[in-house]
Structures are given as C-alpha cells and as structure tokens.
Amino acid sequence: MFHRIEEALEDLKQGKVVIVCDDENRENEGDFIALAEYITPETINFMITHGRGLVCVPITEGYAERLQLEPMVSHNTDSHHTAFTVSIDHVSTTTGISAHERATTIQQLLNPASKGADFNRPGHIFPLIAKEGGVLRRAGHTEAAVDLAQLCGAEPAGVICEIINEDGAMARVPDLLQCAKQFDIKMITIEDLIAYRRHHETLVTREVEITLPTDFGTFQAIGYSNSLDTKEHIALVKGDISTGEPVLVRVHSECLTGDVFGSCRCDCGPQLHAALAQIEREGKGVLLYMRQEGRGIGLLNKLRAYKLQEEGFDTVEANEKLGFPADLRDYGIGAQILKDLGLQHLRLLTNNPRKIAGLQGYDLTVTERVPLQMPAKEENKTYLQTKVNKLGHLLNL
C-alpha cells in the first residue's frame, strides 16, 4: 500500500512530489511534500490545484534566525504546536499569490545572500520551524519535510500542502491512495520515516564504564546517553561477550516501584534479580536497564494507571484511559546499545514476544527465548493474566 522511504527519496531528488501521511491518532491527514531547493511554479500550481490546502515551507531554526522570521503568535495554542512564523513575500513580487511568485519567494528564502529585509510581512508563504531532531522529536509533516530534504542531501527545507478532497473534507488514506495512483506519486508514512531514521542513524553514545560489584556478582556497568531525549540507560555486562556466540541478554524496563520498593503489583523486581542471578551463573551475559518507566508512560502516569486499576480497570485499559497505547516502548535505542556492545545473536530472557519482534526489527537475531517467569502473587495475578490475554505474554498461570 505504501512505498519504501528509499523510493520516495529518489523521486524527491528528481524534483517530484510525494505524499506523506501521519498517524491516524494525530492529524490523520496527508500532505504533498517537495524539496524547497527544487521548487518550481509548476509544482506550486499542482499543489494548490490538487491539494487545495495551505502552502507552507518547513525550515530549520537556522533559516528563521538568519531571516529574522518571528513566530506568528507569541502564545501558540495550536493542539499540535505547529510553529508558524510570520508569513512572507519576497520584495521582488507583486501580490505574491501567483504560483510563479510563491515559487520565487521560496527560492529566495533559500538564497544564502537573502536577508530579513528582503521579505515583506505578511505575505503568502508560511514558513514553519521544524524541531531539532526532526520526526524523532515530533512526528509532524513539518519535521518530515526537513528530514526528507536532509536525507536527500538537499537544503534542509521543504514545501508542503495539505490534501483536501473536492467536497472540502480532509483526504484520508483511501482518498490519498487514489490520489497517489492517479498522479503516479509515491506515498509514505511518517511512522516509516521514523523507523528509517532509527534504523540508519547512530543515536547512542557510550559515556562511561566502571566495575560494579553487586549482591549477584561483579559486572561492568556501561552508561549510555542518546540524542533523542535526556534519558540515560545502563548495560551491566558479565564476562567475554565478544566471541560471536549467542549471548544471554535481558532488556529490562525501569520499574521504580518494583525494582526499588519491592512492589507486589508487578513481577518486575523479581525478574530483575532473577536475570542478574542467571547471567552470573552462566558467567557471560548482558542486562540492559532501559529508562522506560511504566512501559514508556513515565512514573507519575504509571501511578495514575495504578489508581485506575484500583477503580477496576486492568493494566491495558488504564493506559488507554490515560490516552496511551498499551505499550509505548520502542526498542530502537536498546538495539543500538546492544550493537554498540558488539552483540548480534541473542538468547533473550523474556516472556514478551513483542520484545523479540522489536529487537529483531533492528537487525538483531534472537536465537532463543529464555523464559523468565516468576511465581504469581495474590496482588499481581490479575495483572499477569492481563499481560497474557491482551499483550500476548507467554506465561503459565
């Protein structure tokens, strides 16, 4: 149904337009996107004729600063925090509204010799400032356009236009597919662009390594940062893991209440201790401790989910009532840390098939699933049963 990111990049490099769709839980829309560096009046005319939306120009913060493009409003109340600057026309244009003059404004916006004084305000081109980090920070069309331009080796700026049906309603995926077929346009998703970047870019940095004696044995503790957020992760390494043989690995998501306070609501603490003990017995392995509290929703939201569970919701329903997916974790950063440690083949300590699929999606091979089941307690029987029934965990209860 959708094309590969590589196919879209090839078309963009040729000056063609692509369609980019975002998540159905976000704006749930598709935009025409082209590279600003290759924009022509013909492309602008195509967008306004068949897209019918607002023509905008996603740019980096650097462009906005150089051209003194101030935010359109001082207090942004847009639900998606779209970062409009003041609209502009190049001083050489007349009304600025024609396809030719809009293309001229965009071309001059990219001209390194242009200054802020070269543009009238307001105008008919609407620059948007992309967040640094692109779609890995904000999954919007603004960031997608700049990311695609950078992946093409072009100036980091794009031209976008929302696609609206002839009846005035927003075009959804079936409409967008028909549009792509009619005009022979490649169609991709922001979700796939995120996956592409995570797969092809190094996002983790090894910061520090120490010897860590524990109650379970002595490990090498290696601390990692990443370029996506402020979260810091740690790998506890035992023995020589560089032999090329499958290595026993536990990817453990942080659970303050279970790991530190011994909460009986979950089985996280016992799993953590059992994994360390098993790695110590084998004399070789890795425990990767990921700062993904509450399956990725954070500590306070996890406590809010617990409150809902006290009212009768299960762990999945509680997450969803708070507006989160059942499991918000992403395994891309963890996979990059494991690769940095030199691992390729894993014997994975887990009861969660999705964790296996998540790691294998980043070119790691799970040669064996090693069960890590803890005895159920009265306080967590319902929780564990929900993990089996709704999250597909492999447990014998």
Curated annotation (Swiss-Prot):
Cofactor list: Mg(2+); Mn(2+); Zn(2+)
Keywords: GTP-binding, Hydrolase, Lyase, Magnesium, Manganese, Metal-binding, Multifunctional enzyme, Nucleotide-binding, Riboflavin biosynthesis, Zinc
InterPro entries documented for this protein: DHBP_synth_RibB-like_a/b_dom, DHBP_synthase_RibB, GTP_cyclohydro_II, RibA, RibA-like_sf, Riboflavin_synth_RibBA
Single GO term (MF): GTP cyclohydrolase II activity
DHBP synthase: annotated segments: 1-199
The protein's annotated pathway: Cofactor biosynthesis; riboflavin biosynthesis; 2-hydroxy-3-oxobutyl phosphate from D-ribulose 5-phosphate: step 1/1; Cofactor biosynthesis; riboflavin biosynthesis; 5-amino-6-(D-ribitylamino)uracil from GTP: step 1/4
Binding locations of D-ribulose 5-phosphate: R26, E27, D31, R138, A139, G140, H141, T142, E162
Annotated site (Essential for DHBP synthase activity): H124, E162
Catalytic reaction(s) noted: D-ribulose 5-phosphate = (2S)-2-hydroxy-3-oxobutyl phosphate + formate + H(+); GTP + 4 H2O = 2,5-diamino-6-hydroxy-4-(5-phosphoribosylamino)-pyrimidine + formate + 2 phosphate + 3 H(+)
Gene Ontology terms: cellular component: cytosol
Positions annotated as active site in the UniProt record: D327, R329
Chain positions recorded as GTP binding sites: R250, V251, H252, S253, E254, Q271, E293, G294, R295, T315, T350, K355
EC number: 4.1.99.12, 3.5.4.25
Keyword Coiled coil (UniProt): no
Binding site residues for Mg(2+) 2: E27, H141
Residues given in the record as Mg(2+) 1 binding sites: E27
Pfam families per UniProt: DHBP_synthase, GTP_cyclohydro2
Binding residue positions for Zn(2+): C255, C266, C268
Cofactor binding description: Binds 2 divalent metal cations per subunit. Magnesium or manganese.
Region (GTP cyclohydrolase II): 200-397
Biological-process GO terms, alphabetical: riboflavin biosynthetic process
Protein task: Catalyzes the conversion of D-ribulose 5-phosphate to formate and 3,4-dihydroxy-2-butanone 4-phosphate.
Family: In the N-terminal section; belongs to the DHBP synthase family. In the C-terminal section; belongs to the GTP cyclohydrolase II family.
NCBIfam families in alphabetical order: PRK00393.1, PRK09311.1, ribA, ribB
UniProt-recorded name of the protein: Riboflavin biosynthesis protein RibBA
Organism listed in the record: Bacillus cereus (strain ZK / E33L)
Gene: ribBA
